[in-house]
């Protein structure tokens, strides 16, 4: 049985002082021994968040990282910088990074490899646009994203990663993929991993659904056979996140 993982993506929200306040507010609400709880916070708040989360079941993740360890990359953050302060997870390839910062599948792959090299668990995002869904190419599109993201990743490494399926048309729009749509794509992702690495790895890897997850939609989504939790956006900034974590 795969352990559920529910991660909050705070995006560009909350100052360091606001981060402390929110984590203190959420600590008692997200207690759940059966779920891995992760807060992915802005880079400037990572150290503060790690300190605030001490003694709780909350792990802290970054929202992005670069694929080099040092050098003339103004504004970027290296994986060894993240591990040095105790970061455990990193979101890679979020649709907003792809859209606003021109991240390609190849860039995503480089970041995945470097995160794994440094012992950081990557939360690898994939998803389709509304146009791609309407064209009926959702599965083909996502399979392509997965295959490139996992280039040169070993089966042992792949089993430790997290994949987040985020239909782009459902992010921050209030629209949610139906439970059937979400399960269909997550199942297809697991099949793709099985083709790349075999059934054992496919059954080990955890797949999240991300896209306007709410306390109301979480119970049905998270009880699907191939959905192992969620990558939660706006709702992770509210007390409602506690209800999502304790969805049962």
Curated annotation (Swiss-Prot):
Subcellular locations according to the entry: Cytoplasm
Primary subcellular site in the record, as a coarse category: cytoplasm
Pfam families referenced in this protein's UniProt entry, alphabetically: TIM
One annotated Gene Ontology cellular component of this protein: cytosol
Pathway of action: Carbohydrate biosynthesis; gluconeogenesis; Carbohydrate degradation; glycolysis; D-glyceraldehyde 3-phosphate from glycerone phosphate: step 1/1
Gene Ontology terms, MF aspect: triose-phosphate isomerase activity
GO biological process assignments: gluconeogenesis; glyceraldehyde-3-phosphate biosynthetic process; glycerol catabolic process; glycolytic process
Quaternary structure annotation from Swiss-Prot or TrEMBL: Homodimer.
Full protein name: Triosephosphate isomerase
């Amino acid at each position: 049985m795969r352990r559920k993982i529910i991660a909050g993506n705070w995006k560009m929200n909350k100052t360091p002082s606001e981060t402390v306040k929110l984590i203190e507010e959420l600590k008692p609400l997200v207690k759940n021994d059966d779920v891995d709880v992760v807060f992915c916070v802005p880079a400037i708040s990572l150290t503060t968040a790690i300190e605030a989360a001490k003694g709780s079941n909350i792990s802290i993740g970054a929202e992005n990282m670069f694929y080099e360890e040092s050098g003339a990359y103004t504004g970027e953050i290296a994986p060894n910088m993240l591990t040095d302060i105790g970061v455990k997870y990193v979101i890679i390839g979020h649709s907003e990074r792809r859209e606003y910062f021109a991240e390609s599948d190849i860039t995503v792959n480089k970041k995945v490899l470097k995160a794994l090299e440094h012992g950081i668990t990557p939360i690898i995002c994939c998803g389709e646009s509304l146009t791609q869904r309407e064209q009926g190419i959702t599965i083909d599109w996502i399979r392509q994203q997965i295959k490139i993201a996992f280039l040169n990743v070993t089966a042992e490494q792949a089993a430790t990663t997290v994949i987040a399926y985020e239909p782009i048309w459902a992010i921050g729009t209030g629209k949610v993929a139906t439970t059937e749509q979400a399960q269909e794509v997550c199942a297809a992702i697991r099949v793709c991993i099985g083709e790349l690495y075999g059934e054992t790895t496919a059954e080990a890897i955890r797949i999240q659904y991300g896209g306007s997850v709410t306390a109301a939609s979480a119970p049905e989504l998270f009880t699907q056979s191939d959905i192992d939790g969620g990558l939660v956006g706006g709702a992770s900034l509210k007390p409602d996140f506690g209800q999502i974590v304790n969805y049962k």
